[in-house]
């Protein structure tokens, strides 16, 4: 989840509200937040950037928890693999130890160069860290400008779409498993009866998976119009390289225009016109067939003779696409 810097995002848990207030006041009082609280950060260097990792004091574990630092490195490597570099030169990652097992409640803030808070259960295992998607999702948020609240779908949609692809490109996720999950989950982004466009219908499914649907359709169309020379990753890198990261406020139209300039085709702007204020329901079954993706139980089978098989491979692997 990306914190709503421009329009008072409603944080849905008391724990997140308290944490946000604590972080805000500590940052007002001191430029060295970790030092103020008596916490010493552990620094990870990845993708040309510095990630300071702090485990909050008083919890059931500390920075030495098995698998924890590898988890941070893997997430940073995934984002770097997709964007070509880590989105911000220096961020702070605050880990909140909680009871139970698993990783949850990640929030990314446009503060101090980039701040991520996330909760980790005391019983979380190295295997849990290795299979996690949430920290990668939060780090992707660093790579897109803050936009108005009615465009929140693009922030969450990009993070939802890019995260599994980034993990595949970093060799941390199996491509067949990735595409199986996309085929399984993307229909949640299709408009339901009574839904409007993405700017007007703000349900969970339309925000996260509707935004991801926009990204997939854009990715396929960019590849189609450029004969697989460019993809959505080029558009998003172009936005980031033009200064469009979480620390700045941009109009969505500006971000899409910059992305289109990076690919040389007006796909993002045209698709936004199609999906922003009215429901649009693409034929996903036909799209999967064109891409050569056949669902087979709990996995998928790839058909490399399909019309857009080369596009599927380019989306999956980027510049390292097997020939």
Question: Where are the regions a protein language model picked out?
Answer:
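Acidic/His/Gly-enriched intrinsically disordered linker/tail segments
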Residues: 150-213, 219, 224-226, 232, ...
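Beta/coil-rich, acidic/histidine-enriched accessory regions frequently appended to metallopeptidases
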Residues: 35, 245-323
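Surface-exposed patches in mature extracellular/periplasmic domains of secreted proteins
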Residues: 82-94, 146-152, 170-178, 229-235, ...
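Sec-exported extracytoplasmic/periplasmic mature domains
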Residues: 77-84, 144, 164-171, 219-227, ...
């Amino acid at each position: 989840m990306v914190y709503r810097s421009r329009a008072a995002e409603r944080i849905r848990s008391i724990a997140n509200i308290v944490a946000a207030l604590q972080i805000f006041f500590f940052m007002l009082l001191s430029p060295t937040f970790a030092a103020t609280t008596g916490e010493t950060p552990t620094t990870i260097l990845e993708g040309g950037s510095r990630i300071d990792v702090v485990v909050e004091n008083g919890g059931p574990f500390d920075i030495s928890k098995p698998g924890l630092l590898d988890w941070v490195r893997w997430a940073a490597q995934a984002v770097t693999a997709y964007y070509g570099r880590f989105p911000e030169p220096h961020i702070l990652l605050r880990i909140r130890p909680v009871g139970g097992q698993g990783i949850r409640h990640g929030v990314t803030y446009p503060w101090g160069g980039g701040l991520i808070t996330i909760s980790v259960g005391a019983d979380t295992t190295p295997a849990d860290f290795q299979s996690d998607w949430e920290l990668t999702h939060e780090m992707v948020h660093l790579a897109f400008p803050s936009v108005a609240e009615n465009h929140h779908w693009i922030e969450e949609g990009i993070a939802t779409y890019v995260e599994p692809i980034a993990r595949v490109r970093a060799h941390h996720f199996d491509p067949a498993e990735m595409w199986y999950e996309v085929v399984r989950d993307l229909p949640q982004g299709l408009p339901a009866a009574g839904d409007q466009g993405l700017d007007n219908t703000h349900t969970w499914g339309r925000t996260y998976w509707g935004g991801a649907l926009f990204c997939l359709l854009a990715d396929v169309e960019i590849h189609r119009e450029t004969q697989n020379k460019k993809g959505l990753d080029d558009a998003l890198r172009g936005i980031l390289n033009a200064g469009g990261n979480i620390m700045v406020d941009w109009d969505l139209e500006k971000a899409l225009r910059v992305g289109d300039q990076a690919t040389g085709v007006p796909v993002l702007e045209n698709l936004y016109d199609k999906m922003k204020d009215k429901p649009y329901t693409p034929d996903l079954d036909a799209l999967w067939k064109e891409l050569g993706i056949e669902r087979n139980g709990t996995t998928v089978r790839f058909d490399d003779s399909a019309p857009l098989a080369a596009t599927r491979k380019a989306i999956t692997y980027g510049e390292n696409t097997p020939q």
